Every structure is written in C-alpha cells, then in structure tokens.
Design a protein with these regions (language model features):
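Structural preference for beta-rich elements and adjacent junctions enriched in aromatics
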Residues: 1-216
C-alpha cells in the first residue's frame, strides 16, 4: 500500500492559482500516478504526478499531466467529467465507510460525490462544488477533443466544508484512506491509471479496499 505524509502549511488563505508556488516554496514532493492496472485492454499511461498539502481547513493539490490528446467537453459541475482529460482525488475523511470523489477535468469543471461505493452516490449541490477553487493552465472554457500532445496543470483548493456528509473542522494527526487517478473515458485512447494499485478484473476506481494512506 502506498502512503504519503501530507505536510501542513500554515497559511491564512490561498487561491488555487497560488498553490504551485506555495508547494514549491515548502518543498512538497510530487508523487507519480503510474499504475496501469489493466494493461491488456488499456495499456496507455500518460505522465501524471501530484503534490498535496493541507492547511487548517483545506487540502491543496496540484496535478501535472502530459498526454497525447486532451478533451474538456463537460459544461458544468457534476457533468460527466470522467469522459474528459480528468484528474481524480478520492478520500475517506472519517473512517466510517463514506468516501468522496472529487473529479476534475483539464478545464476546471468538476464532480463531487459521496457514498460507500460506486452505486447510490450522492452528488454535491452547486453551492458546495463552487467552494472548490480551481486553476488550470488550459483555461476554464470547455473544448472538444484535441489530438495533439499536451502538457497541462491543475490546482485545487478543497476546503473541508465541501465534505457535506460530515462536519470536519480539523484533520490534523489523522490517517486517511484514498487514491488518485488519471482517466479519459472518451479520449481517442482511453486510459485508467492510479496512484495506488487496483486489483479488480476491469477498470473501477470506486474500490476503497484498494485505497492508499494519507497521513496528516
């Protein structure tokens, strides 16, 4: 099982755009997302890495991606962002079986849901998703598939208040379970890559039994 020690950064307020520089200043290391769990059917592995830190009340995450084509068709939050060039952060903040999936495409459109597994997930209301500040090097305007090698970056500030089935005021000292993924279901070459390995016979990111550890 992979494990990351998530460093705490003492900062009163930070925008998503400021996150890359803040993580660099605090020497936060990047972690590769490189597990091709279904190599026979989906062998393609884009380059992806992420750095993560936390503050008193939020996660700060920065993704760096290089892939052979890009797509950002989803128009609004909670649309089918996983069909686009998508980076995903799954996290179980309370150890009660519930986990949140925060899926964001390369244009900063995201999906936020909660549940115990793939089925019967509850999506966040718009007033919740808008609390997640996003910044991307590709801008915020949706676009159709571009079949050209592209490098892009995405930063998210995820306040604990978006974990809407919980009342979390602090995660200091906690050990959480979660995973990070890169996918693109409707790209010319679909792919399903993970930070922590997954042992299911077919692509499935909703597998908390294969989550890694995040130590805060």
């Amino acid at each position: 099982m992979n494990c990351i020690d998530i460093k705490k950064i003492s900062v009163a307020d930070v925008t998503a755009k400021e996150i890359p520089a803040l993580l660099k200043e605090n020497k936060i290391v990047y972690n590769k997302v490189e597990n091709v769990n279904w190599p026979k059917e989906f062998p393609y592995r884009p380059k992806m890495e992420f750095a993560i830190a936390h503050t008193d009340d939020a996660f700060l995450i920065h993704y760096r991606v290089e892939e052979q084509s890009i797509r950002a068709v989803a128009q609004k939050d909670n649309d089918n962002v996983w069909e686009d060039s998508c980076a995903e952060f799954f996290i179980s903040p309370a150890g009660d079986g519930l986990y949140y999936n925060i899926e964001c495409n390369c244009a900063g459109t995201l999906l936020l849901g909660v549940g115990e597994g793939r089925n019967n997930r509850v999506l966040a209301a718009p007033e919740i998703t808008k609390k997640i500040d996003r910044w991307t090097t590709l801008g915020r305007t949706p676009f159709d598939t571009k079949e050209q090698p592209t490098a892009w970056e995405l930063s998210l500030r995820i306040p604990y208040s978006v974990f809407f089935r919980h009342n979390i005021t602090s995660l200091d000292g906690c050990t959480l379970r979660g995973n990070v993924y890169k996918c693109g279901d409707n790209l010319p070459v679909p792919h399903f890559v993970s930070w922590n390995p997954i042992g299911t016979p077919a692509p499935d990111f909703h597998c908390p039994e294969y989550f890694g550890q995040f130590k805060l």
